[in-house]
Design a protein with these regions (language model features):
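The feature captures the beta-strand-to-loop junction immediately N-terminal to the Walker
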Residues: 49-51
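Helix-to-loop junction immediately C-terminal to a conserved catalytic motif
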Residues: 64
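ABC ATPase NBD coupling module
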Residues: 27-30, 81-98
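Signature (C-motif/LSGGQ) region and adjacent switch/coupling loops
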Residues: 29, 85, 113, 129, ...
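A short, flexible loop at the N-terminus of ABC-type nucleotide-binding domains that lies
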Residues: 9-13, 22-35, 86, 147
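Conserved ABC transporter NBD signature motif
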Residues: 72-80
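Conserved ABC ATPase "signature" region
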Residues: 79-80, 127-144
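Short coil-to-helix segment of the ABC ATPase nucleotide-binding domain corresponding to the Q-loop/switch region
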Residues: 110-119
Length: 151
């Protein structure tokens, strides 16, 4: 009994209610998600698995605020993503959500250091770029790759 009580006291960090997504291709509607209800509590890990085309990427894009649902809601740490503007949604994405994309690429014409600097510049953390990139690569044991390009 105490296990259930302990779990119920943990904060809900991701909540979807009747989440639906319909893509429109011309006049044709293609349902991607129908009525997804889920709650992820603080400290929990969730794996999204299924066959190709079942809606995994759509669900993750909705959870990340990259898409707006056709119906239903997504709340991240109590914030309804559909009820906030683009700037606030970007702030939530930066501060509360992490992404690891299946296909990620460094820019092939830039060094490892320059790729890190670019990412920091895009995300508004432009101070101490060179030091931060070097420190990060050193922490990862990649300081010898500082000036190498991905190719």
């Amino acid at each position: 009994m105490s296990k259930t009580i302990g779990m119920s006291q943990k904060k809900d960090v991701v909540v979807t209610e009747n989440l639906q997504m319909v893509y429109r291709i011309g006049k044709v509607e293609v349902p991607a998600l129908r009525g997804v209800d889920m709650t992820v509590k603080e400290g929990e890990f969730v794996a999204v698995m299924g066959p190709s085309g079942c809606g995994k990427s759509t669900l993750l894009h909705l959870l990340g605020g990259l898409l707006t649902p056709s119906a239903g809601s997504v709340r991240i740490d109590g914030i309804d993503l559909a009820s906030i503007g683009d700037n606030k949604r970007t702030e939530v994405r930066r501060n509360k959500i992490g992404f690891v994309f299946q296909r990620y690429n460094l820019l092939p014409t830039l060094s490892a250091e320059a790729n890190i600097e670019l990412a920091k510049r895009i995300h508004g953390n432009g101070h101490k770029l060179e030091t931060s990139a070097r420190e990060l690569l050193t922490m990862l044991g990649l300081e010898h790759k500082l000036h190498h390009k991905p190719s």
